[in-house]
């Protein structure tokens, strides 16, 4: 069974590194409070680790 995680953006991308903005875009997050569901895999986990200070993660 594929596990999903829910990722919610909690902080603004204003003033952060361009690499972090690109990671948010790669996850599909556009604004504060926006949430997306993604499959739980090593690629997504690496992206979350990079911007962990900007997002909240919930296991589904």
Curated annotation (Swiss-Prot):
Keywords: Ribonucleoprotein, Ribosomal protein. Gene3D superfamilies: Ribosomal protein L30, ferredoxin-like fold domain. GO terms for cellular component: large ribosomal subunit. GO terms for molecular function: structural constituent of ribosome. Part of the 50S ribosomal subunit. Belongs to the universal ribosomal protein uL30 family. This is Large ribosomal subunit protein uL30. It comes from Baumannia cicadellinicola subsp. Homalodisca coagulata.
